[in-house]
Structure formats: C-alpha cells, structure tokens
C-alpha cells in the first residue's frame, strides 16, 4: 500500500490515511491515490465533503497523485460523465484496441522522464528507463506539454507522469515498483517545491 511504502522510506514522519477535512488541512504534504474508476472516485470525494479541502491543499502543499489519483487531476475522462478536479488542463483517454497487446496495461514497463522534467527532484536517483508497475486502461493527455514529466510506450507513447509547481503525479504505482518506486516516494517526502 501507499501508506506502508511511505512509512518505509520516512520512518520519522507520521503517515496518516484519512477521510477527514481537518487532516488534509493540517498535513504538510498529500498523496492522492485512487482505485477503480475515476467517476466513482470523484463521486466519493464529493460525497465525503473532502473536495474543497483537497482543492485548497493542492494550491500550496506538495501533492502526489497515483494512478486514478493522477487521472483525477485533469478536467474530464472518457470513462464517464464525471468531471475531474481540473488542477491540470487535459483529459483522460481510454486505450484503443491494440492487439496483440492486452488492455488493461498490466505489469512492468519503462518510464522515460521528458527532457524538461529529467532534473525534477522526484526523479533524483532514478535512472531514465527504469521499470515501474502499471495497472490501467486509461491514460492522461495533458493539454500543456510542459506538464508532461515522463512517457511510456505501450502500443502508443503515453504520458506516465505529470508535474506542475507543487503537483507531481504518476500513472504507475510507485508502491508496487520495488526500489525505483520507493526512491520516488523518498524523493516526494523530501520535496520542497
């Protein structure tokens, strides 16, 4: 899990898993994970009353989106009528038919930081082309290419990480990605945008 990975790389820090607005407002950084479908995650976020707290936190606090958490940062998704958080311009697209490749894209794949993002603090100590673990049928398409922090090839070249100011997000799961994933979490804990 994300919390276990963070506890492993930052044993002196307190890691809290919470669905309380107060915890989000008091934290010094935030991880937005997600599981399932973006419309369901957005619906649960709105129903929980956390949406406003999350949007306020995203203005200034380091924020790391993971998988659906990355997708939720964008404006909309082909997955359903739900709107995203619109913290980044762009949309979430479904992989088309890519025979003989299977959808969902599941397993290890290489991640290539973009030239403009290669020196981003979250990539520190991670070699370009390192393997990370993916499980997804959708990918983000950023409207602003300067937000693309990495790409991956799976039938097409798709965006596998994005960044802007205090926000960084990955389509892959760092917590399932062995040493490279733990290093990314360690870098996030130290990141001071």
Task: Specify the residue positions occupied by each region the protein language model found.
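Gly/Ala-rich beta-loop-alpha elbow adjacent to hydrolase catalytic centers
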Residues: 65, 69
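Pocket-forming structural segment of enzyme catalytic cores
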Residues: 75-154
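Glycine-rich nucleotide phosphate-binding loop and flanking beta-alpha elements
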Residues: 37-39, 70-72, 139-141, 178
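N-terminal beta1-alpha1 cap of cysteine-dependent amidohydrolase-like domains
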Residues: 1-62, 78, 91-96, 100, ...
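C-terminal and late-domain segments of enzyme folds
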Residues: 129, 139-193
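Proline-centered loop/turn at the N-terminus of a beta-strand
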Residues: 62-64, 131
